[in-house]
Amino acid sequence: MKSVLISIHPKWCELIASGKKTIEVRKTYPKLPTPFKCYIYCTQDKRLSFWRGKAYAYAYDIRDNGKVIGEFVCDLIGLHPGIDVPSSCVPIEELKKYANGKMLARWHISDVKIYVRPRELRDFGKTRPPQDWCYVDAE
């Protein structure tokens, strides 16, 4: 069964793990029936780290950035103009700029699981992270 590996910046990973961010906004979306599983790849950031044990909060140790830190179920996808989407935690002006007058896909985030130990990309048959998202085979 196909799943998705999605690249997300550390600041958004923290908000997803805390339950504050329940919508992921993207320009595209997978052609999969919902619900489907999404694996969260926490992108590398030289200044911030999301992954710090059970606290799941920023720290100055960035060794675990660049790994798959958890998963969620996308149970609904909706198209939306680039206007206010409060559950995305993205400011309206940033959404408008990102949308550039086009529709955006709202991926609804549910059933978030953060791993006790982050996983490597090679566990998903990948040697480098996706620019945005990519299909992967489910385990």
Language-model features: where?
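Structured alpha/beta reader/binder surfaces that contact nucleic acids or chromatin modification marks
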Residues: 1-139
